[in-house]
Regions:
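Sec-dependent N-terminal signal peptides
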Residues: 1-6
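N-terminal signal peptide c-region/cleavage motif recognized by signal peptidases
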Residues: 9-11
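Transmembrane beta-barrel domains of Gram-negative outer membranes and organellar outer membranes
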Residues: 14-275
């Protein structure tokens, strides 16, 4: 989801860079398992902790394996196991569970939509609240050459330090040929809903991205630049994904679009949290 770890001053949580995607409503086929590995490196990031006891994002490697399973042609379940590596120290951020509802066959529609609910349990170095909820609407349009997708995300933290933040993400991309896209992705965190942070303390990051396939493997690569003081200045993101064959078929050709939660990726376009 983008979210650069760290902010000016203290906030209740450090928005993690474990998953940087814009969801495009693509899901796994019924009975299909997909696996993605997210890896994101903060080359130039925040050097101060986002809250007392938190860890700064500078020179950190963040990621998560993502497992998704298609329940129906409009419903998918997913599991994440986020982590970070910094100064040769491995830090686990527990787990996230998600349930995604979409318009069926979203990868074949000119207008597509959906909504994702993601429940997370986070460790003390990553957040001051243990439990959180992400609500991510998905709205997109595409034609033969272009696609435009918006995820107006609301991140909710529960407990004493909890708050609801507005953290939208968006993507515009052009299709160069089958399974090859280039474009821009934008991730932000405006802060608490009803009391947005000053601009300098908001997170706004712009990524140049490309999605392509190597055999049956989907690859998403992007380089992001932070536009405000509170944003990580330089972030490199990658997603490597594979959709297992649907039971009863001979190959893995029956894969949904991916890039949304990027799951069965027809083309790996989008998802993100802010980041």
């Amino acid at each position: 989801m983008l979210i650069a770890l760290g902010a000016v001053g203290y906030s209740s949580h450090a928005q993690a860079t474990d998953e940087i995607q814009v969801y495009n409503a693509g899901i796994a086929a019924v009975g299909q398992l997909t696996v993605q590995q997210h890896l994101n490196y903060v080359g130039i990031g925040q050097k101060d902790p986002p809250f007392p006891g938190g860890f700064p994002s500078n020179h950190s490697l963040n990621g998560t394996p993502e497992f998704a399973y298609g329940m129906t042609d409009w419903w998918e379940l997913g599991l994440y196991l986020p982590f970070a590596v910094q100064d040769r120290q491995f830090l686990s951020d527990a787990f996230k569970l998600r349930t995604l509802f979409v318009s069926p066959n979203a990868d074949k529609r000119n207008l597509f939509y959906g909504i994702n609910f993601e429940l997370s349990y986070e460790m003390p170095k990553f957040a001051q609240t243990r439990w959180g909820l992400e609500i991510r609407p998905i709205i997109g349009v595409r034609n033969a050459d272009y696609e435009f997708i918006v995820n107006p995300i609301v991140d909710v933290g529960f407990g004493r330090y909890g708050e609801a933040d507005f953290a939208p993400a968006a993507r515009v991309a052009r299709k160069l040929k089958d399974d090859v896209y280039v474009g821009l992705e934008y991730y932000a965190d405006f802060g608490k809903i009803g009391a947005f942070s000053p601009l300098a303390e908001q997170q706004h990051t712009l990524f140049a991205v490309t999605d392509f396939k190597v055999g049956d493997v989907d690859i998403d690569f992007g380089v992001g630049y932070g536009l405000t003081r509170a944003s990580d200045r330089l972030v490199v993101k990658t997603i490597i994904g594979y959709a297992f064959p649907v039971p009863g078929t001979k190959d893995s050709s029956e894969r949904a679009s991916a890039s949304g939660p990027i799951n069965p990726m027809a083309h790996l376009s989008a998802r993100s949290t802010p980041y």
